[in-house]
Amino acid sequence: MCIRDRSLRADGITKKGGKIYLSASNGKVLNSGVIAANSQQNQGGSIRVTAENIQIDENSKISTVGKKSGGLIEIGGSWQNSNKDVFQATKTTIAGGTILDASAFDMGDGGEIVVWSDIHNSNSKTTVKGTLKAEGGKIKGNGGRIETSGRTLDIDDITISTKSTLGVDGQWLIDPYDIT
């Protein structure tokens, strides 16, 4: 499955952002465009990308930003593999210049971002070189949470923000077997 230089959107205006699921279980997902499930007046939506091999190219943008709270972005798996229905990637690559954003922009908590590959598979590798944000709203709200996990994890050029202007900063969970 390939999304090249295109936009795939499920934005909400007064309602919560929509849901976008891209799945190629034993195949490959390649994205070099915009995938968005934002909301101008409510909570950001959810985006899930699952495949054996996931490649998010340079300057891609994936966002679930919302006024009242950030949404959910799952690339390659779920938080700590908590949802067994979500297929786990073997290789997940987020290129430099990419932005993943699950922030609240006004008065809510930041959302959740997971970039994952199967930590139990000896061939698994997660590489993240982009910017990941799950920030709390500017008026009020706590920071969200971000997880980067894989058997081998390369986060050499990553930028992370779970900050909150007036609330509590969020968390970044790093869960590799081997890290560079």
Range-by-range predicted roles:
Residues R4-T180:
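Extracellular and secretory-pathway beta-repeat/beta-biased strand scaffolds
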